[in-house]
Amino acid sequence: MSRESENTDDEPSKWMKFRSLLVFSMLLRVFLIVYGEWQDAHMEVRYTDVDYIVFSDAASLMASGESPYKRTTYRYSPLLALLLTPNSFFHRSWGKFLFSASDLLVGWFIHKILKQRKVPEKICTYSVMVWLFNPFTFTIGTRGNCEPIVCAMILWIILCLMQGNLLQAAFWYGLVVHFRVYPIIYALPIILVLDTQVFRSGQKPALLYWNTGQAKTPASNMERKTFLFNLLTTLKSLFSRERIMFALISGGVFLACNAVSFYFYGQEFLHEALLYHLTRTDPRHNFSIYFYHIYLHYERQFSAVEKLISFLPQFTVQFALVFCFSQDLVFCIFLQTVAFVTFNKVITAQYFVWFYCLLPLILPWSHMKLKWEGLLCIIMWIGAQTHWLLWGYMLEFKGVNVFLPLWIASLLFLAANTFVLVRIIQRHRFSPLFRRYESSSSSNNVTKED
């Protein structure tokens, strides 16, 4: 029997294995939701995230015809409250099931994206397991956090781009930026990748597939340089049809969602869902290195210059990453997300899920072995986080004044994040998402998706 026929025969069993993973993951999440209901009723420490209570209260207000922003600390899109209105008349755990379903959808999208790039099934399975069986990710949805919905939309946008569905990608991108502001950082790399040598009218973009060689051999310096984006080429086709269409549709959807929300909820929506996230200063302890400065000077208003300076590290790193890696789109937005969280003015644990959903998509192109280098990075990152949490526990639950050691722990956490990020970049095999149509002769050699 030929190898092709053997691979064809193996496909049903491979699909069954992946489906079994999804079924087991679903049962695990259902169990955690049911267990969470029991823990909330019988134990002092609640399983349910405090944010879920805020979401549910806002949804209840919306269901009764009032503004969800009457609920203090609700600072999200009205769409979230709308999605959770069944909490009021169906069951209070409706939202948890919705978020957990989105969590499973993320796993399915990860598998789909990797298969589209011809990653072997075994590697696909391991990559999906990094998401589905990560204790942090399978608890965040079951505890009632909405981030899995955002992750699912972002992966769907990537999948739409890979399939050449620019209209869908633009629509969902405008929607996800309205739903959660932070994906706005992906606008520039997406626009840059919509090159006329990649997206041509009437043609599906050709993907650059995974191959065995790139899993074993690190990229040379010359190869890395070829992946730096050619600025001159960009300027020549800056206003291409695809870029203009994507910008107009995504911008139109974003503005339309905001206009409808503003029509119903006015300045409350504008301030709580949008402006608040741009000017947020949190005096409570969090992972950010800025928290101590904000805590010491919270009584006074920060000047515009001080607020701008706090954004400069983020802007600088973002532009540098986009310039270097935009053609390797998935890797670029992963790096952007990690850097955005690392240098943000406020960092909470739920933000980590923003890049957890992208991590499985870059693993097949990484040369970092779990033993020892990968293990070292994991220990360093978790160790720095645990060290911070110990000081946070002393402050929060014991009432001990440990603000200075806690700030030092934040500095160490920043250093750990930076070290791990640099190692990931160094051990990554740079691979553009799309092949470029250099000429009519070379286009005949482009391997298109089956």
From Swiss-Prot:
Query: Which keywords does this chain's UniProt record carry?
Result: Endoplasmic reticulum, Glycosyltransferase, GPI-anchor biosynthesis, Membrane, Transferase, Transmembrane, Transmembrane helix
EC numbers: 2.4.1.-
Q: Which family does it belong to?
A: Belongs to the PIGM family.
Q: What does this protein do?
A: Mannosyltransferase involved in glycosylphosphatidylinositol-anchor biosynthesis. Transfers the first alpha-1,4-mannose to GlcN-acyl-PI during GPI precursor assembly.
Q: Name one GO biological process term.
A: GPI anchor biosynthetic process
Which class of enzymes does this protein belong to?
transferase
Gene Ontology CC: endoplasmic reticulum membrane
Gene it is expressed from:
PIGM
Top-rank taxon of the source lineage equals Eukaryota
**Organism, as annotated:** Arabidopsis thaliana (Mouse-ear cress)
Q: Which residues lie on this side of the membrane: Lumenal?
A: 42-93, 143-148, 195-243, 336-345, 396-401
List, alphabetically, the Pfam families matched: Mannosyl_trans
Which pathway, metabolic or otherwise, does it act in? Glycolipid biosynthesis; glycosylphosphatidylinositol-anchor biosynthesis
Q: Which Gene Ontology molecular function entries are recorded, alphabetically?
A: alpha-1,4-mannosyltransferase activity; glycolipid mannosyltransferase activity
Its membrane topology, per UniProt?
A: Multi-pass membrane protein
Q: Report the protein name in the record.
A: GPI mannosyltransferase 1
- Give the stretches traversing the membrane: 21-41, 94-114, 122-142, 149-169, 174-194, 244-264, 315-335, 346-366, 375-395, 402-422
Tissue distribution of the protein: Expressed in influorescence meristem. Present at low level in roots, hypocotyls, leaves and stems.
Per UniProt, subcellular location reads as: Endoplasmic reticulum membrane
Question: Which of the residues are on side Cytoplasmic?
Answer: 1-20, 115-121, 170-173, 265-314, 367-374, 423-450
Q: What happens when the gene is disrupted?
A: Plants display cell walls with decreased crystalline cellulose, increased pectins and irregular and ectopic deposition of pectins, xyloglucans and callose.
